[in-house]
């Protein structure tokens, strides 16, 4: 069964869009109304939303050695009961005119020190559409993990990055999902891999020969 949204952008009327903060992130204040499920228009409402550019996420996978390469880094926006060091997939924001593949390759090298051989599109998602305008696209990236240095720390000094590498057997995917991983993109990437990883490995190995 396929799902189709009931309404589209033509069923939203924006009467005011004001930029109230313009820094690394942008904050907009919008006045709008939308079509309700009974066909009538809602009352006008004001919504504040953070606006970011699209981002690319990449789960790094070595099909030959059956390894997944993930990163750990500090994140400041965590509640007090959570550790601000998170296990994540490689990710980066799309700059103007940049292709997804270029972002994936750049971030894989900067954050994990590896080169991507090829990419497999997984899915797209919006992380928090109630207050954040951001569109993320997830890929699997083929790598050679044989030379990965787990003792190295990576990332760009100018972006205050301090990144540690973690290399997992693909057989550890379900165990990882049962642990305290709270990063949404990492959880979704591992869930996708649990469903499709074997097929992806077969596909990549077949075309490597």
What are these model-predicted stretches?
Residues 1-31:
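N-terminal presequences and immediately downstream first alpha-helices
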Residues 1-7, 11-12, 72, 78, ...:
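Nudix hydrolase/Nudix homology domain
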Residues 32-37, 128-150:
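Active-site-adjacent beta-strand/loop module that shapes the phosphate/pyrophosphate-binding cleft
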